[in-house]
Curated annotation (Swiss-Prot):
One of its GO terms (biological process) is formaldehyde catabolic process. This is Alcohol dehydrogenase 2. It comes from Solanum tuberosum (Potato). Its cofactor is Zn(2+). Keywords: Cytoplasm, Metal-binding, NAD, Oxidoreductase, Zinc. An alcohol binds at residues 50, 70.
């Protein structure tokens, strides 16, 4: 048994004290895990755009002071009452959404949207008792999406922890706990392109490139990348993208351009930007009779999707997805195995590595649009 089991652990954490201000490295107290919770030692975390979005807090409920971070990998330090599936020393990925295994969603093979542990960006406390497990001088520091991985130790509900192969390199597979799995699963689990098919990917950021990687793994023969930034195409080739379309280069709607390129439309499309015009284009560019469009990007809350009903009546299908339709505990371990079996390449997503003390540099890189994923090493 760990000497820290049942004890408060004092450790370093990068605290967001207020919106848009640099994170501050603080000494925080991390309470022991309560019923159905685990305390994790975080070894590697990466920065996702969602962290930046809620750090800026321009359009959402500001919850501060807070410990952000949700893409990470670590080791179980201790477990709370009732936890039987995990033990100290297990290698794990904390996930921003969960799988209680008891609700109707968890019991359905068609859903990964757990009723109990579905992502909640406003909640800054644990669901067990409505309290935070983090504090500084007795004052609570709030959690973020149930994970808060910008801390050397964190407490997470057991349903939000995926136990993985202990041989998997944590500094690589940490990126699978959010964006990469979201894009990959959108293609493999929802769009389901067949070998030799054509796929259009809208948005060539990390999630879009993960969707392209899924199309490459599925054996698509044409992978058309759509982005307003022409400089992204060279990098996209590494992920299987064969052609590039910049909507700014054409006077006609991009869906018409793609339809002309592909003799009536692509077999599948995956939209990863969240811009409503791109969503409409992604749907209208798929072939009638069998085309499937999948929406991944999160739109503005006032956005309205408009298309003519004949696009549906002509047998086009529109689908949405959340976290690539992966159930965190049941499915993410198998995604790690795809990497271990060399089916999935993760190294090309990782463009920067920084020590924990320089975490604010990772925010700067993302705000400048430089790189894809920056791995933050927690131990010096």
């Amino acid at each position: 048994m760990s000497t820290t089991t049942g004890q408060v652990i004092r450790c370093k954490a990068a605290v967001a004290w207020e919106a848009g201000k640099p994170l501050v490295m603080e000494e925080v107290d991390v309470a022991p895990p309560q019923k159905m919770e685990v305390r994790l030692k975080i070894l590697y975390t990466s920065l996702c755009h969602t962290d930046v979005y809620f750090w800026e807090a321009k359009g959402q409920n500001p919850v501060f002071p807070r410990i952000l971070g949700h893409e990470a990998a670590g080791i179980v330090e201790s477990v709370g009452e009732g936890v039987t599936e995990l033990a100290p020393g297990d290698h794990v990925l904390p996930v921003f959404t969960g799988e209680c295994k008891d609700c109707a969603h968890c019991k359905s093979e068609e859903s990964n949207m757990c009723s109990l542990l579905r992502i909640n960006t406003d909640r800054g406390v644990m669901i067990n008792d409505g309290q935070s497990r983090f504090s500084i001088n007795g004052k609570p520091i709030y959690h973020f999406v149930g994970t808060s991985t910008f801390s050397e130790y964190t407490v997470v509900h057991v349903g939000c922890v995926a136990k993985i192969n202990p041989l998997a390199p944590l500094d690589k597979v940490c990126v699978l706990s959010c964006g990469i799995s979201t894009g990959l699963g959108a293609t493999l689990n929802v769009a389901k392109p067949t070998k030799g098919s054509s796929v259009a990917i809208f948005g060539l950021g990390a999630v879009g490139l993960a969707a392209a990687e899924g199309a490459r793994i599925a054996g698509a023969s044409r992978i058309i990348g759509v982005d307003l930034n022409a400089s992204r195409f060279e990098q996209a080739k590494k992920f299987g993208v064969t052609e590039f379309v910049n909507p700014k280069d054409y006077s006609k709607p991009v869906q018409e351009v793609i339809a002309e390129m592909t003799d009536g439309g692509v077999d599948r499309s995956v939209e990863c930007t969240g811009h409503i015009d791109a969503m409409i284009s992604a749907f209208e560019c798929v072939h009638d009779g069998w085309g499937v469009a999948v929406l991944v990007g999160v739109p503005h809350k006032e956005a309205v999707f408009k298309t003519h009903p004949m696009n549906f009546l002509n047998e086009r299908t529109l689908k949405g997805t959340f976290f690539g339709n992966y159930k965190p505990r049941s499915d993410i371990p198998s995604v790690v195995e795809k990497y271990m079996n060399k089916e999935l390449e993760l190294e090309k997503f990782i463009t920067h590595t920084l020590p924990f003390a320089e975490i604010n540099k990772a925010f700067d890189l993302m705000l400048k649009g430089e790189g894809l994923r920056c791995i933050i090493t927690m131990e010096d």
